[in-house]
């Protein structure tokens, strides 16, 4: 039924966490190839409003500023206090994380911009909304983690860093979690309020985790 999707050549879902919005919508990010070329990849949203009985795909995906021929992939989403969605995108070719926003529950997105304060390898990471003033906390805290070493033919990804933002993604600070080769990572808020980190450590991506 969708003339655009009829031309898609390949789709896979980003590994790791999805997100549930305050209105109940559950969503994951799809990585879409719209031609027979490897890149660019486009980040459309797969979402359900009925607990998974039916699924829809967003009309739009973020354009990628300064790197349109390579794009980005394996994005993750958090919901900001005003309902705006923030998408963090794995970069391809430009080693800075890309951020984009949506104000219509993920149906359309603005252009994703690279962030100089989020140096990033081309590797999957995660982002979570850790604490919100809407829930009685003293600060808004968004946490993200990913590898910071550029991923090239001669340099594997590594040196994962944990970053935090107190102003809903406007500015970021971070620190090194591990020195050396590393792969994908995922974050979770544990029952005691601490942050759980699941990460691939080493250059083979076969363990340990």
What do these predicted regions represent?
Residues 1-209:
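Asp-box/BNR beta-propeller blade signature and adjacent active/binding-site loops
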């Amino acid at each position: 039924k969708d003339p655009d999707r009829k031309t898609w050549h390949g789709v896979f879902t980003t590994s790791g966490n999805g997100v549930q919005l305050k209105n109940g919508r559950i969503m994951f990010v799809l990585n879409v190839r719209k031609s027979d070329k490897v890149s660019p990849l486009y980040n459309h949203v797969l979402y359900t409003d009925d607990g998974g009985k039916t699924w829809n795909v967003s009309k739009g995906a973020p354009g990628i500023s300064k790197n349109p021929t390579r794009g980005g992939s394996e994005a993750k989403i958090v919901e900001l206090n005003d309902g705006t969605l923030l998408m963090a995108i794995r970069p391809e070719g430009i080693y800075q994380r890309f951020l984009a926003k949506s104000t219509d529950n993920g149906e359309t997105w603005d252009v994703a911009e690279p962030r100089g304060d989020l140096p990033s390898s081309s590797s999957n990471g995660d982002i979570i909304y850790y604490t919100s003033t809407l829930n009685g906390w003293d600060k808004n805290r968004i946490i993200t983690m990913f590898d910071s070493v550029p991923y090239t033919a001669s340099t594997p990804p590594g040196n994962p860093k944990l970053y935090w933002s107190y102003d809903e993604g406007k500015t970021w600070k971070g620190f090194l979690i591990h020195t050396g080769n590393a792969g994908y990572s995922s974050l979770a808020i544990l029952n005691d309020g601490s942050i759980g980190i699941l990460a691939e450590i080493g250059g083979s991506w076969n363990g340990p985790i």
